[in-house]
Amino acid sequence: MVKAMPEDIKQEANKVVNVDFTGQEQWRNDLKLDGNGGIRKDSVVNIQLLLDNDPAFANVIAWDDFSEMLIKTKGVKGLPIRKGFWTDEDDAVVRSYMEHKHNLLFSKQNEQDAMVVVGKEHSINPVKDWIEAEKWDGTPRAERYFIDYLGAENNEYTRAVTRKWLAGAVKRVYQPGCKFELVPILEGKQGLGKSTAARNLFPKKFSDSLKSMGKTDEDYKKLQGNWIMELGELSAMKKTEIESAKSFISAQSDSYRGSYSHYVYPHLRKCVFIGSTNQQDYLKDATGERRFFPIRCGVTKPTKTVWRNEESVPKINHDIHQVLAEVKTWVDAGESVFADDKLMQLAKPYQQEAETVDPMKEAIEDFLNMKVPSNWEKLSLSLKASFFHTHIDHNGDVATWLQQHLDAGELQPLQQTTTREIMEVVFDKSVDRYLMGRTGSEAKRIKLIMDNMDGWDRERVRINGQRSRGYVRK
């Protein structure tokens, strides 16, 4: 129960806190008092009331719902407090101000708690405000965003990837933590403005400071407060980092201790990722292909400038507002943000083109594309290896080999195989060495390649009279 200030100490209280109570009976009566009728200095509520009713701090302190951080919407006249995120220095300034103006020295913890309470009473979401800044005028623009600004290929694939990604970006603002893992990779020479095009979507909530993906706790904290996250150069990523990167991109929440928090708890994802590269081959892992969608830029002449200057900024901002307003109509109508089978088929040639050269995969493809004798399944592994290497060494001319070793009629496409067969026939890795554990890494690589090989399904097969796990041509 709030204890009202006794009438006989009003005059003295006015002198102590240096506040004019005239016409402000309600908030004055809410001040917490100590046993002697003085204003309590250990009260969070008292700090909150003083800040809420101080004209100098009117509409200054707010809570950024998107960043989950305390902010200053403007500066405070006469104090070294400037617009931006709240800092430790600002805490010190407020405590000093309270002591100078009101003769009240509050504890640092109570002052910080009060700041959060005041901020939460005035919550804002800058990204929602940015998206909703203008009403869509009905002119389609969004699907052509990278086409118009970066001269990207004007085709169904580019428009589909752009649509999915923008829809995912907007959906994460309104539905934090929604499942979304599509990452466009803007390909093209330096100077096109690839990073700038991503930044322009909302410069204040863009970051390119993420140098690794999930390797340290700092990676997760960098996501806080940013909407568009540009990835580092994918071609520089080691294969050992691929798995953690895939998990990092696919996560729907991140657990860490946020600002103004003593606790570790899950923070729902509000950001999306985009990459840019000057390389033509940068994808190193077939299992990551479904996340990365290359977009070739600089193919056509851009119809809009991506570069911001005094003249172009109003035009760019208006266009961005219209793009985002359009995308919001998609999301409001239930737009799917998942890459469907059609998009995956459209993406496949682009993803394959972006893959780094893998000699091991090329050798396996040579083996799978080779035509073999009709009695192939009955041949020993050593004889199969001899046939394969003859095929490679003589550019597919195996007639002489067949005459010398067997007469098996017309050659036909290979129909099934196993990891062991590939390991011994293609890479000369004997079973003895395999059982000794020396070729475990090769076996894993072969399995990974075959699991993602077009035209082949993983099934149980029978080879040389024995059943084992293998792969069958579709």
Regions picked out by a protein language model, each given a short descriptive name:
Residues G225-W227, Q252, R269-V272, T287-F293:
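Short glycine-/polar-rich loops that comprise or flank the Walker A/P-loop
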Residues D219-Q224, G258-S276:
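AAA+/SF3 P-loop NTPase mechanochemical coupling elements
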Residues I228-I249, L283-E289:
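Conserved AAA+/SF3 P-loop NTPase catalytic/coupling segment centered on the Walker-B
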Residues V118-Q224:
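P-loop NTPase catalytic core of nucleic-acid-dependent motor ATPases
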Residues K284-T303:
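A short helix-turn-beta junction within AAA+ P-loop NTPase domains corresponding to the substrate/partner-engaging
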Residues M1-P140, Q403-Q412, V431-Y434, S441, ...:
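N-terminal nucleic-acid engagement/recognition segments and initiation subdomains in replication
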Residues I242-Y265:
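Conserved catalytic/switch belt of AAA+ P-loop NTPases
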Residues V337-K474:
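DNA transaction DNA-binding modules
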